[in-house]
A protein has these predicted regions:
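Short polar catalytic/cofactor-binding loops
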Residues: 19-25
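A short acidic, helix-capping loop that chelates divalent metal ions and anchors anionic groups
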Residues: 25-27, 64-67, 101-105
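Aromatic-lined carbohydrate-binding/catalytic grooves of carbohydrate-active enzymes
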Residues: 51-77, 93-96
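Active-site mouth loops of central-metabolism enzymes
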Residues: 26-39, 109-111
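Active-site region of glycoside hydrolase catalytic domains
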Residues: 2-11, 78-322, 332-431, 435-440
């Protein structure tokens, strides 16, 4: 059963938003709590609707809904899900947006991780059978890389073997959680969002690494999709770093094919690799005026993966002119590739409100606001709120609230969402590559 009102949007393009929702309970980090969305979810969801977004990426927090093995607490989810359904907004539900419960041990490096994720998926699908769209795992490649290879996030491991181990577990979690959902809702649809990047080598030594990274960006989608056979360019690399042939065979026999590929793309998503003074590889963001650009990356991802594309995360941290320039550029490039027949079916500004402490990679508490949203966050001392204020102050336990302040970028966004897609992103040209392809 779909929410009332869903289906009124144009069938081949949607404007979307969401709320940054990463959690790392091992260090007490919870972005929805830092931004106070966990308290003010109702007014935030109404702001998303007012911004013209009838489809929204919305996450649950695994450690909150599943506080102990096989124990469930849906009190933080029931209200938002009920409101979304009442408003006729369609959620694409993030079941695992980084962060596993403390009781889950080593998380993505644990052999039982896929089973735990499947339990979560089944429990959610049983409770909310009307939900149709799912993201079982947000950025599974990034989760594997940051948790298993670079040590940036829990479980803080390093090296290619731990990366491949995490990759296998996370990809299997996608497959098993998706199978669990489809048992309960056979017509459910899946969108996995992951990094949309490109590496440019500036010297000969960097060329090999750039080539590897430009192959690796497709790796997670192709692994859980059962597409890695003997002729895959990274098959030998995977086996050399611990992937068993039996693992690859399992994925080919139990694929989780996507309905939509989610592209997470920002101004810093193209890289320049060069050799530093001590022989180390240096990775920096490529200047915008030298980038291939979103249109070319869409062509590459569609040619490789052959599925409809959605900008599942995008935005430009900074002031309003920076955000508006990025949005205008992205819309122009989406119009270009849709005119070529590349099925780009949505843009998601991430997130609707500013973030807190994302500048630290959510590794340290500084309570610093990162200017990423269409609504700016500003600290207010609620103790001095005028008693006659028309709206009650949204306060936290310390007497402070984060006020949501509309920006000029929001007004630009709303002009796009209010207009016909034919006049903004243009019609999707028919082609042999998208013929008969299910979009929304």
């Amino acid at each position: 059963v779909s929410p009332p009102g869903v289906g009124a949007e144009p069938i081949d393009f949607r404007w979307m938003t969401g709320f940054e929702c990463s959690t790392f309970p091992q260090i007490g980090m919870d972005e929805l709590a830092l931004t106070q969305h966990d308290r003010f979810w109702g007014s935030d969801i109404l702001r998303a609707l007012d911004a013209g977004c009838r489809t929204i990426r919305y996450a649950i927090r695994w450690h909150v809904v599943n506080p102990a093995p096989q124990a469930w607490d849906w009190s933080s989810v029931d209200g938002p899900m009920e409101l979304l359904r009442h408003l006729g907004m369609e959620p694409i539900v993030d079941l695992f947006h980084f962060g596993v419960p403390v009781w889950a041990g080593t998380g993505v490096l644990s052999s039982i991780f896929p089973d735990l994720q499947a339990e979560l998926a089944a429990a959610f699908a049983r409770r909310y059978p009307w939900v149709r769209w799912y993201t079982p795992t947000n950025e599974p490649y990034i989760m594997s890389q940051f948790g298993g290879e670079t040590g940036a996030w829990y479980p803080y491991e390093h090296g290619p073997r731990n990366f491949v181990r995490a990759l296998r577990n996370v990809a299997r979690g996608v497959c098993e959680s998706w199978a669990a959902i489809r048992e309960i809702r056979p017509d459910a649809r899946m969108m996995i969002s992951d990094t949309c990047e490109y590496w440019h080598a500036l010297d000969e030594r960097a060329e090999q690494r750039a080539a590897l990274m430009n192959e690796r960006r497709f790796l997670m989608h192709e692994l859980h999709g059962g597409r890695i056979g003997d002729d895959h360019p990274l098959r030998d690399w995977l086996v050399r770093h611990g992937m068993e042939e039996a693992d690859l065979a399992w994925f080919r026999e139990n694929p989780a094919e996507l309905d939509v590929i989610g592209l997470d793309h920002y101004p810093h998503s193209e890289h320049e690799l060069s050799t530093g003074p001590r022989g180390e590889l240096v990775d920096v963001a490529r200047p915008l005026d030298r980038q291939l650009g979103p249109a070319e990356l869409c062509r590459q991802y569609f040619a490789r993966l052959g599925r409809p594309l959605l900008f599942a995360e995008t935005g430009a941290p900074g002031d309003d002119p920076t955000k508006i320039a990025w949005l205008d550029r992205l819309v122009d490039e989406v119009r270009t590739v849709r005119g070529e027949g590349v099925p780009v079916i949505g843009i998601t500004w991430w997130g609707l409100i500013d973030q807190v402490d994302w500048g630290t990679g959510l590794r340290r508490f500084r309570y610093e606001i990162d200017p990423t949203g269409l609504y700016a966050l500003e600290w207010r001392d609620a103790r001095y709120e005028p008693a006659e204020a028309p709206d009650p102050p949204e306060v936290d336990g310390r007497g402070y609230r984060l006020e949501r302040v509309p920006t000029a970028a929001l007004e630009t966004w709303k002009r796009y969402t209010a207009a016909s897609p034919e006049t903004t992103v243009g019609p999707l040209a028919s082609s042999s590559t998208n013929e008969g392809m299910a979009l929304w």
